Amino acid sequence: MRSRNPFFYERFGVPDTVDGRFDMILLHSFCVINALNKQGQGGRELAQALYDVMFVDMDRSVREMGVGDLSVGKHVRRMMKAFNGRMHAYQAGIDNASLDEALMRNLYGTVTGTVDPTNLTIMGDYIRNQVAALNTMNPDRLMQGDIEWAPVPGAGIKQRAPIVEPQKTDQAVA
């Protein structure tokens, strides 16, 4: 639930919209999946399971927003494509300035007007800090989903992620 923290929207100018919230979910998912992928085969399998559960939930969310059954698959595929593109952009930019460019294009892409460059820098640093923290945390805790996020800069917020058991579903994501 870290991505829903109002601080990102109120202080750092992330749009408090469906798109802004979607991008915050993708950013935090990137951080976790990036760390899991470094934990060998078991980590890669868990990363894939997280991806699968995430998009089953996206499917449910799209339906709850009133998208018709015939269009849901198309919407979810578009979201998956967006996620995959962002994963590559964030991975490529984690060690350089192209992360800020990717954040500007994606996280702040729907902002009308000027994006405060300080917010962009803070968000880039925030993501880099999360990746570093997750890459150095105890692998057993990471694999159990016992994630401790690095603090949000300037917010004094440090948060543990609740361990959530995935719901079983018969739905397949197209």
Functional labels for PLM-detected ranges:
Residues 1-174:
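Surface/interface-facing alpha-helical segments and adjacent flexible terminal/loop regions used
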